[in-house]
Amino acid sequence: MRVHAAFTPTGCNRGVSRIGTAFVVRIALAGAALAVVLGVVRVVLVQQAALTRRRIGKPLGEDSLDADRVWRRSLGGEPLELLVLGDSIAAGLGAERRKETLGARLAKATGRRLQRPVRLRTVAVVGSESPDLPSQFDALPEGYLPHVAVIVVGGNDVTHRLPPALSAQHLHEVIRRLRGMDAEVVVGTCPDLGALRAVPQPLRRIASGLSRRLAEIQAETARRAGAEPVDLRRAVGPMFFDEPEAMFSLDRFHPSALGYRRTAEALLPAVCRAAERSLSSPRPQETR
């Protein structure tokens, strides 16, 4: 009896070899196609990022208003020391009057709640990222001891694609140093960048996901380091999504006076709790 070559071991091997080769070819083609798609996506995202920078520009400049002073001075008594660190939101870029900045709004509202003056000191710098926080701390004068420190940072970490672990590391470091001064710390987590209408899709969707993830990491980091986090995405994000014309300033990136008001209102309960804890504890005598 003759056996057809296709059913001999050699024939089987050839068939398997042909199938294996075809499979490898398909995988290679799929991989090449995916690489092309990813390359196209990368080019599109780079182009969209450049478009976003052109759209937003810098109509507000890079200098925020100086709101540092004693607020609610007429209430009398020893002022509460309020320190603000972070990026352009913390610095108040976009506010047209100093009383509209985030720090000033927090100082005024906290003073009213506690019925005492509040001395505001702002070391936040426009354009800052989380790795800049330690240098902001280092800029404090010798012997300065804040009762409460507020940190708002993260947007530039996302737009400049900083690794979240790096952002968390520097946030943890500055919280630890502030806590070492017996300061109570409040952290406003990264806002949802999906609210930025000036950013085209799909870049806006990607930025939204990245900012949400960073906010989660910031909240966990803050709690572990002894600070109280405030989820700004949940607290004020819907307002920025629903009323962008009112909540954003003319650059469509930074908050307007109303945007800062709503952000301060979201932070205020945590700031007041922090102030009450600090005021009820003995102040350290030693300097930094």
Segments and roles (model prediction):
Residues 1-82, 268, 272-288:
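N-terminal secretory targeting modules
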Residues 81-83, 91-169:
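Conserved SGNH/GDSL esterase-like catalytic core that processes O-acyl groups on lipids
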Residues 122-124, 189, 231-234:
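Residue-level recognition of beta-strand->loop/alpha-helix junctions
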Residues 137, 171-175, 215:
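Generic structural signal for well-ordered alpha-helices
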Residues 152, 188-189:
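Alpha/beta-hydrolase-fold catalytic nucleophile elbow
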Residues 181-183:
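A short helix->loop->beta-strand "cap" motif at the edges of active sites that frequently abuts
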Residues 194-288:
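Catalytic His-Asp segment of secreted/periplasmic serine-dependent ester chemistry enzymes
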